[in-house]
Amino acid sequence: MVEVFKTNVENIEYARLLLRKLMAQYPNYHINFDLQDCDRILRVEGNQVESMRIIEVVSGNGFDCQVLE
């Protein structure tokens, strides 16, 4: 399953920080950012992606995050 999120992460350093935090909690997920996309995309791939938990981690670090419809 792949879930795509729209974020407001613009800086590569913040993206790396969030990736470290997300990978610490979800080591079996494949996670990456596409900061060149206008929606600052966060892609998460895993057997069962916990969208609300991903949003909580990103939001808890001061960024907007929502599932891209």
Segments from the language model and where they lie:
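Short Gly/Ser/Thr- and Asp/Glu-enriched loop/turn motifs at secondary-structure junctions
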Residues: 35-39
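Conserved short beta-strand edge segments in small beta-sheet-based binding/regulatory domains
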Residues: 32-33, 62-69
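Gly/Ser-centered flexible loop/linker motifs
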Residues: 27-30
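Short glycine-/aliphatic-rich beta-strand segments at the starts of folded cytosolic domains
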Residues: 1-11
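Helix N-cap motif at beta-to-alpha junctions
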Residues: 46-51
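Short amphipathic alpha-helices in soluble, non-transmembrane regions
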Residues: 18-22, 54-61
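A generic structural motif
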Residues: 40-44
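Short amphipathic alpha-helix segments
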Residues: 9-25
